[in-house]
A protein has these predicted regions:
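Conserved pre-motif I regulatory segment
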Residues: 2-40
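Conserved helicase motor core of P-loop NTPases
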Residues: 6, 25-29, 37, 152-157, ...
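Short, conserved phosphate/pyrophosphate- and ester-handling motifs at nucleotide-, phospho-/glycolipid
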Residues: 22, 76, 268, 426
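ASCE P-loop NTPase helicase motor core
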Residues: 27, 31, 36, 40-224
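Short coil/loop residues immediately preceding or within conserved phosphate-binding loops
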Residues: 39, 323, 416
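Short, solvent-exposed amphipathic alpha-helical segments in soluble enzyme
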Residues: 88, 279-283, 449-453
Length: 475
């Protein structure tokens, strides 16, 4: 098919006259598809309000109408769910698509790409890390390397990376490598790229997108010498919430849009903990440490519990990922062992079609400031459980017993009413509350600007800025 036909069909699928930036992206995409060389990739970068999501959906619908195979991927379960909703096609996480388990309790190797003539579209690509993760059980530990290797090992398969450079880069990295044409061309690929900068007219009436655009321009021009001033007047979708009104306002959000569509975003685990305790005690009136209906976030990858279920349910996911959210259905059998606290939970995972799983969880991580068990705590748990198998003669057999021990493999969890921005990234909620904590001009860093932009753009309907200072408010 000629490139011109692709262009016409994508514009038709879009349903309105594209902006100049969108038209350029459509032209570039058509050239990318028409290139006869297999070693080509495309980067579609765009910030909030520029129509990147709408254009991605139109591209997917056009490809399907032409009977072209497409695979939709995203870095997290929540991001995959959002991508699927926006495009009308199922999406999965990158990890679940490109890795397969080598052995029970073992590592995951790169799966063979059995697809042919397939377009792989990856949303929220700013989150894809490529720093080798120590002790990673996935492939090489470099996710971007593995993704590229996987896609191009399939016959006539191509990759489109979609994302927003203004968002926070992966932890430990200066920029998002998956959105860098220099980085992607380093794989021996010819890179087609397009940037959406023009904010759509309907987006200009949104306070969330107006202010996000102002913040993004500070990033683009690298000119942040003072904290950004936020415009509230004339925008019903962005409001300032004084601390003494927070409990009542949060309760209203829960009743209006539900817990699944409400999120508090903070700058640290410490602040998130304070919010989680306060929300449970003063908004939800929960006294028990855990109760049915509680929202949790998994804070460390876990393979053990899904393995147990795979014996009876082959459709069970290969693992539960760090950042996955779950709702408690039942709580049973609290017990103290090895100097830690454990409980049996029946969980439902809303981002995975309400998949249900029974686990033993570790409650010590619920209120700690560390992201998960500390190195010292992990070592203590290892030593204590290992001592239970002291009578087992050989070291390999002791390790085998340890790997099969439910307490050693207990799920590490935190409450999920308030999270850090890195944990919220990739997700969107109708109502988002942002607490930046105490800030001064002297504390201003590029990282803070990326943080603020990412936090603002998690909200789809209403943004609540908690205790927002007058010095950061546009008069």
């Amino acid at each position: 098919m000629y490139a011109i036909n692709y262009k016409t069909l994508i514009v038709q699928a879009l349903g309105f006259e594209p902006t100049a930036d969108q038209q350029h992206a459509i032209d570039t995409f058509a050239e990318f598809l028409a290139d006869r060389d297999d070693h080509v990739a495309m980067l579609l970068r765009g910030s909030a309000g520029t129509g990147k999501t709408t254009l991605s959906g139109a591209i997917v619908r056009t490809m399907l109408a032409l009977k072209q195979r497409v695979v939709l991927l995203a870095p997290t379960g929540r991001a995959a769910k959002v991508f699927a909703l926006n495009s009308g096609v199922p999406a999965s996480t990158i990890h679940r698509r490109i890795y397969r388990q080598q052995s029970l309790g073992g590592s995951f190797s790169l799966a063979p790409n059995m697809m042919t003539d397939t377009l792989f579209l990856v949303d929220e690509s700013s989150m894809i890390a490529n720093e080798g993760l120590r002790e990673s059980v996935f492939g090489t530990g470099c996710l971007l390397d593995d993704l590229v290797q996987f896609v191009y090992s399939g016959r006539n398969c191509r990759l489109v990376l979609i994302g927003d450079k203004a968002q926070l880069p992966p932890v430990g990295e200066e920029e998002s490598p998956a959105l860098s044409s220099a980085f992607i061309s380093g794989y021996g690929l010819t890179v087609y790229e397009s940037d959406l900068r023009e904010v759509l007219r309907q987006s200009q009436q949104s306070g969330i997108l107006y202010n996000a655009t102002v913040i993004r321009q500070m990033i683009a021009h690298d000119e942040a010498t003072a904290l950004p001033k936020i415009r509230f007047s004339g925008f019903p979708d962005i409001v300032c919430v004084p601390g003494d009104e927070l409990i009542e306002t949060l309760a209203t959000s829960y009743s209006q849009v539900g817990m699944d569509e409400t999120m508090v975003v903070t700058r640290s685990n410490k602040r998130a903990n304070i919010y989680n305790q306060g929300i449970r005690n003063q908004v939800l009136w929960r006294e028990e440490e855990l109760t049915s209906g509680d929202w949790l976030m998994v804070v460390k990858n876990s393979y053990y519990w899904t393995e147990q279920k795979k014996a009876e349910d082959t459709s069970a996911p290969a693992f539960i990922a760090n950042g996955d959210r779950a709702v408690i259905q039942r709580v049973r059998n609290r017990r103290d062992l090895y100097g830690f606290h454990f409980v049996d939970l029946w969980l439902q995972f809303p981002d995975y079609d309400n998949y249900e799983l029974q686990v033993t969880a570790l409650t010590d991580t619920l209120a700690t400031e560390a992201p998960a068990l500390t190195r010292e705590q992990s070592q203590q748990l290892f030593d204590e459980v290992m001592a239970d198998y002291a009578d087992v003669r050989t070291k390999p057999e002791r390790y085998k017993r340890l790997k099969a021990d439910p307490f050693y493999n207990a799920l590490q969890i935190k409450y999920a009413y308030a999270v850090t921005c890195h944990k919220a990234q990739g997700g969107q909620w109708a109502h988002v509350y942002v607490d930046q904590g105490y800030m001064t001009d002297e504390m201003l860093t590029p990282d803070y600007i990326h943080w603020l932009y990412t936090a603002f753009t998690r909200a789809t309907e209403k943004l609540f800025l908690v205790n927002w200072p007058k010095t950061q408010t546009e008069e």
